[in-house]
Design a protein with these regions (language model features):
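Polybasic, proline/glycine-rich intrinsically disordered low-complexity segments
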Residues: 72-153
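A generic structural signal for short, non-catalytic loop/turn and secondary-structure boundary residues
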Residues: 36, 45, 57, 71-73
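Negatively charged, low-complexity tracts enriched in Asp/Glu with abundant Ser/Thr
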Residues: 1-47, 125-153
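Canonical SH2 domain fold
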Residues: 48-68, 77-78
Length: 153
């Protein structure tokens, strides 16, 4: 409840065209809670918003403004803490897409890598991946990741 009607500190807001399959019913409250330290995110739905926060600090990082339909959810707008944008609004959208797929749907999909890491050594990329996505960040991609359908984990 602490996040209701809040946005991340130092946020940017941008439009989105994300959509996901949906059962048609939900209750307000947590939709994903970290079970172990290697889970890096918590996710809550209140009203028409999905709040995504860092699990161990509670820092609110993303708010996805949702439109719940009978069989899918559309996300038309995202508010993101500028720290997670990496100078690329599309990248921030990819992060939200990955978090929904990997955490709420338990899918195995590639996580997005920011362009700034393209020239970095593999160990730097691996460190970023673990810090950002923990045990769900199995493999990353610099390419477009929205639209990739994964396998159930």
């Amino acid at each position: 409840i602490e996040y209701v009607n809040k946005v991340p500190d130092d946020y940017v807001e941008f439009s989105s065209d994300l959509n996901f399959a949906y059962s048609g019913a939900h209750d307000d409250g947590p939709v994903f809670k970290a079970e172990v330290m290697e889970d890096k995110w918590d996710m809550y739905v209140y009203g028409e918003r999905l709040y995504i926060s860092r699990s161990w600090t509670g820092k609110l990082c993303f708010v996805a403004h949702c439109e719940f339909k009978s069989d899918h959810v559309e996300i038309h707008r995202i508010s993101a803490d500028s720290e997670f944008v990496s100078g690329d609004l599309r990248h921030a959208g990819r992060v939200v897409d990955f978090l929904i797929k990997s955490h709420m749907s338990n899918m195995v999909v590639p996580h997005p890598l920011p362009a700034r890491l393209r020239e970095e050594p593999a160990d730097e990329i691996a460190a970023y991946s673990f810090e950002m996505f923990g045990r769900r960040g199995l493999f990353g991609s610099f390419d477009e990741t929205i639209g990739i359908l994964g396998e159930q984990g």
